[in-house]
Amino acid sequence: MSKVCVLTGKRPKYGNNVSHANNHTRTRFEPNLHTKRIWIEEERRWVKVRLTAKAMKIMSKTGTAELAKLLK
């Protein structure tokens, strides 16, 4: 399963860990993904999606209608 948010489209980014001695080590910064079951009222069913914490915050404000459009 890919590490991409369904709603925001966030995906892993690459960069460097920099130590106190200024040594650079390549690393992969993962999005803060969570698997959630969400009730879609229009379709009267549960949907299992992987969302970032920011996407869950957006959904709590706007509702599940936006997610339902993306899943169709």
Curated annotation (Swiss-Prot):
It holds the Pfam family Ribosomal_L28. GO terms for molecular function: structural constituent of ribosome. One of its GO terms (biological process) is translation. Keywords: Ribonucleoprotein, Ribosomal protein. It comes from the Bacteria. One of its GO terms (cellular component) is ribosome. Belongs to the bacterial ribosomal protein bL28 family. NCBIfam families: L28 (TIGR00009). This is Large ribosomal subunit protein bL28. It comes from Chlorobaculum tepidum (strain ATCC 49652 / DSM 12025 / NBRC 103806 / TLS). The lineage of its organism: Bacteria, Pseudomonadati, Chlorobiota, Chlorobiia, Chlorobiales.
